[in-house]
Design a protein with these regions (language model features):
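Intrinsically disordered, low-complexity regions enriched in Pro/Ser/Thr/Gly and acidic residues
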Residues: 93-223, 240
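Extracellular/luminal recognition modules and glycoprotein regions
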Residues: 36-130, 147, 168
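Weak global preference for isoleucine
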Residues: 16-17, 60, 69, 90, ...
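Hydrophobic alpha-helical segments
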Residues: 1-61
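Short, low-complexity, Pro/Ser/Thr/Gly-rich segments in the mature regions of secreted, periplasmic
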Residues: 224-240
Length: 240
């Protein structure tokens, strides 16, 4: 083969290799874009579901009636949680408040003690008025108990419709002036801590029953009279 022939042969080989590399890069790029698009769509669906469920959970604590919760994937379940009123570090009132929790695609929305928490960790945020308010020598405390019956977990990968029905009763008590604190057991303590910090309340954390789920303990530095309201929602959870 002549020198010119060898050069032409090498150019032809280089062209073939270049085309092959270009095709491979294109295939990989399309695959990456497809995966990214799929992830984006999945994240968008999870975010949309979480927002819709958060809006629905906001309405449950309004009192009596039925609330329909709909989502295309994920799980809605009841988790055990306790809210405590403490005097001198000792529990004087303990209520099994429980939490209604929705999870999907890494997103989490929780309704606990009248407050909705959307998200996890440092990204979590609260929605609604705080159940503990201090001022003028008094501590106003709301405890909202789901008292749930029916399904304890509903969900799957197909569209789901859940009806949450409540029939609330209310109990009011006043406790004489002393040093009090309120402990709210929660799997998202950061959101509660930030909300109470913004309200100027003192916070600490404590695991009362050793189950690994901490309670955010809220207190005021002086003696106060406590006005306590316990709202028993008597919740029934049903698919459909």
């Amino acid at each position: 083969m002549t020198a010119n022939g060898r050069r032409g042969h090498r150019r032809a080989q280089s062209s073939i290799i270049g085309v092959a590399v270009l095709v491979a890069v294109t295939v990989l790029s399309v695959g990456a874009l497809t995966m990214a698009a799929g992830t984006f769509v999945s994240d968008g669906v999870a975010a949309s579901n979480a927002q819709r469920v958060a809006d629905d959970l906001d309405r449950i604590d309004d009192g009596d009636g039925a609330t329909r919760i709909e989502f295309s994937r994920g799980t809605l379940r009841v988790e055990p949680r306790t809210v405590r009123l403490l005097r001198g570090g000792i529990t004087v009132v303990g209520v099994e408040a429980d939490a209604l929790v929705y999870e999907s695609g890494g997103r989490r929305v929780t309704s606990l003690n009248g407050l909705v928490v959307d998200g996890r960790g440092n990204q979590s945020r609260t929605r609604g008025p705080l159940p503990v308010v201090a001022g003028d020598g008094r501590l106003l405390v709301d405890i909202v108990a789901l008292n749930a019956s029916g399904s304890t977990a509903v969900g799957g990968s197909d569209p789901v419709s859940v009806t949450v029905r409540t029939n609330a009763t209310h109990e009011y008590r006043t406790f004489e002036e002393d040093r009090y604190a309120v402990a709210i057991e929660t799997a998202t303590p950061g959101a509660w801590d930030r909300a109470f910090a913004a309200a100027g309340l003192e916070r600490s954390r404590r695991d009362f029953d050793g189950d690994g789920v901490p309670s955010v303990v809220v207190s005021v530095p002086e003696s106060v009279v406590v006005d306590l309201a316990v709202h028993d929602l008597r919740t029934v959870v049903r698919r459909g």
